[in-house]
Amino acid sequence: MRVCVTFLLVWTLCLGQAFAHNKRVYGYLEEATLLEQHLTLPAKLDTGAKSASLYAKHIRPIDIHGKPYLQFVVPTKAGDVHFTCVYVGDVDIKARSGEIAGTRLKNSFIRRPVVNMSLQLGGDIRTIRVNLANRRRFLYPLLLGRETLVAFDALVDPKQKFTLKHAVNRL
């Protein structure tokens, strides 16, 4: 009986390791491409954040064939890039220091609009939910949280950065 239990335990551990090796290892910083406009941006892969967040300005709702969309601008060093994406709702995000003027941070939330976007990391493409935010004061215009990392079956190595090669225009 002990032999069977030991065998099953070892087999389970080995099987788990085999599945873990199928995951892609990314650095904590990578270049990601928003395929709607073929815009490649530096992105921070953050296992502490739940959702993806993109620096966007001039956000306005529009209606296309009876469906809700958002038009917005992503500022880049080369100029503004305009997007029109399907609006999927809003999300409440816990406020960070300096995000809400004149309020204390304890239990403060910011409501942000969410859109679906096609994102490419390396050779993989997924449609992800992205909340639109003013990320001007952050170093990276795109933050990819756990939901996106799970969608890409990703592992993040905090010792690495910019491990992927892109052939798409970087602005």
Language model region names:
Residues 5-15:
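Bacterial N-terminal signal peptides
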